[in-house]
Amino acid sequence: MVSIGQMRSLVESTCSKMGDKYASKDAVELVLATGIVESRYEYIRQMGDGPARSFWQVEPASAVDNCQHYLKYRSSLMKNCARASLVDTKYWQMYEEEIW
């Protein structure tokens, strides 16, 4: 398992790059707790043949839906997501599940 202290530091750093609204103590705790529930910070692929990825077990269809129907209309937030994830914004505008 990954050190919870290190995960907290990573989550706090990432949330702060998203903007003040996302860097609150409650927001950080929600993200941290979600990872604990979903994978215990042990797995980055869904067990079995499931499609979910990451410690937070995000399914590609959910990632695409969030990008296409939420972030698409919040360009500033999309840019913050790209910056926080160290991924070019153009990838946040690609809506094919295979990419995610």
Where are these regions (language model features)?
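Peptidoglycan-targeting cell-wall enzymes and recognition modules
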Residues: 1-10, 36-100
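An amphipathic alpha-helix signature
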Residues: 8-15, 28
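Short alpha-helical scaffold segments that flank and stabilize functional sites
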Residues: 18, 30, 37-38
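Alpha-helical scaffolds flanking conserved acidic
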Residues: 24-33
